[in-house]
């Protein structure tokens, strides 16, 4: 299995790691959000703890950065040979799902928070757990490529190949 795409440009690399760091950060500070959201639903002036506010604003930043990332991705798109290899097709599908979830997860959260829709909070939670599962799969695949296949895939996202 060969990785056909050339190296990523600086904007793609910076956006990748910035968004990844923000997602991981928000995931780990989200414990308080359930309580804050319930308080917020009861009284829209309540639930604004420092952590909840940071979580909401980081989520909004993620939406903006994902939009920029998609634009940069399409502007930087290189011609790729469509692979018939099962793992390469699966990787493509997982990448597309990650892009979709990187956008939708904070949109679901913002919809729940700003419009007071409890159901969207539940959707947000399910979607983030799904996305984090795909992120782990993505990370393991990158490590597999780097250390088992030794094809330099991981180095590309560090701008080294």
Where are these regions (language model features)?
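Membrane-embedded alpha-helical bundles that constitute the cytochrome b-like, heme-associated redox core
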Residues: 1-161
């Amino acid at each position: 299995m060969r990785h056909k795409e050339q190296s990523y440009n600086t904007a793609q690399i910076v956006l990748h790691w910035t968004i990844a760091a923000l997602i991981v950060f928000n995931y780990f500070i989200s414990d308080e959000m359930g309580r804050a959201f319930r308080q917020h639903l009861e009284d829209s002036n309540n639930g604004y703890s420092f952590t909840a506010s940071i979580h909401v604003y980081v989520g909004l930043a993620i939406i903006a950065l994902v939009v920029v990332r998609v634009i940069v991705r399409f502007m930087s798109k290189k011609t790729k040979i469509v692979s018939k290899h099962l793992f390469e097709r699966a990787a493509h599908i997982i990448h597309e799902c990650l892009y979709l979830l990187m956008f939708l997860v904070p949109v679901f959260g913002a919809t729940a928070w700003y419009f007071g829709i409890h159901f969207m909070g539940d959707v947000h939670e399910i979607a983030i757990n799904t996305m984090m599962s795909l992120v782990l799969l993505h990370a393991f695949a990158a490590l597999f490529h780097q250390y088992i296949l030794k094809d330099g895939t991981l180095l590309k996202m560090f701008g080294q190949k």
